[in-house]
Regions:
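Cofactor-/ligand-binding subdomain signature composed of acidic, glycine-rich
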Residues: 1-45, 67
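Cofactor-binding active-site loop characterized by glycine-rich and histidine/acidic residues
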Residues: 33-37, 43-115
Length: 115
């Protein structure tokens, strides 16, 4: 899903585009539920601020960007990162403090980024 012109209302009638947005929102929600479970198991160091209920915000803003655009989110940035297309496994590895994470496990949940 490449960025779109927000003035182009025809995308709101494009079923494939809307389906992709919905699938990304479901991905964000599922990711957040799993991250919360891992946090509850004591596998996540530090704290975590989830974006459950805010899936459309991250996915919708990400949909308006191109792959070359940068985005800086708040401490509830999982949805924005996933909406922009950051790899799910790399993000989860980051949250778990693994070297294979987007920031080699040093950023954690609140400092997710992928350059």
């Amino acid at each position: 899903m490449e960025g779109f012109n927000v003035k182009d209302k025809s995308l709101l009638e494009n079923k494939e585009f809307l389906q992709e947005l919905m699938e990304r929102m479901m991905l964000v929600h599922t990711f957040e539920e799993r991250a919360f479970w891992l946090f509850g198991q004591g596998l996540v160091h530090g704290t975590m601020h989830l974006s459950i209920g805010e899936e459309a915000t991250g996915v919708g803003t990400s949909a308006a960007l191109t792959k070359d655009d940068y985005m800086l989110a708040t401490h509830r940035g999982h949805g924005q990162a996933l909406g922009k297309g950051v790899n799910v496994n790399d993000m989860m590895a980051e949250i778990l403090g693994r070297a294979t994470g987007t920031n080699h496990g040093k950023g954690g949940s609140m400092h997710i980024c992928d350059f």
